[in-house]
């Protein structure tokens, strides 16, 4: 079965690219770029012997760079336009900042400048996702890779040290746990979660750079080894500031915006409870949950920021009483 690759409309593309990347101080001081700054300082201090590079790249990337160069299989579900935004049949809005790493590795290998280098790549990523308090379609991410030539080769203790260096710079007082997980472009991978309000929240994934990624980039994997880490900056800021809803980070409310220029604890600006409404929405039976969430956001336009969560509970035409069918104007294929 062919992978679904629907190209996004030019209007949706323009709207996506118009969203400011808050990892970049050029777009104004924000808690997100303050976290990036703290992480960078910690890395420079902890690994003073390594060359440090921060890079930024276009969010529009070839599908090959987003998936193939990072060893994602051709049938990986993430390639589908159910989850990924296609600009053309062969170009996507990056789903992770890791998409730029193989290209950086190739350029570094050609330049012969890789001895011991840490490269960081913060930026905005784009995914088709469901709507809830910890997920959004446009997320801030940051990759941290360290590539070294010769011995000693990087191993699990080195990876844990990198994780703890980053966590110590942002959320030092929080307990974390690391779970074994597989990633296409790493070996000995880990998923790291932080304990927040009695529950575990995933904030980063990491591992040792896959030898094949190094080889395909022009680096001899017998000579080079690496560490790879990608973190969700929005969630880190939520933890630091005590924010429970990811939408708050981009709020235009002046009372909230004033609080987003530092890493102080967030002060709730309203003591009113959330308003709940049950709304019926008719759509074709072949639509996924991600499709429905995106359609609703499109219909609401700027007012979509008021949506806290969409709970998906489907009921087919045949299951509805005749009066409900009449009120909804629903068709048999919906």
Task: Give the predicted meaning of each segment.
Residues 1-135, 147, 200, 205-214, ...:
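Class II aminoacyl-tRNA synthetase-like tRNA-binding/catalytic domains
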Residues 116, 136-164, 168, 217-251:
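A conserved active-site cap/scaffold subdomain adjacent to cofactor or substrate pockets
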Residues 26-28, 145-153, 235, 283-287, ...:
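A generic structural motif
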Residues 2-4, 95-139, 251-264, 301-331:
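Conserved alpha/beta core surface patches that mediate binding of polyanionic ligands
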Residues 43-50, 113, 167-175, 298-310:
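Short secondary-structure junctions
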Residues 154-190:
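Extended C-terminal subregions enriched in glycine
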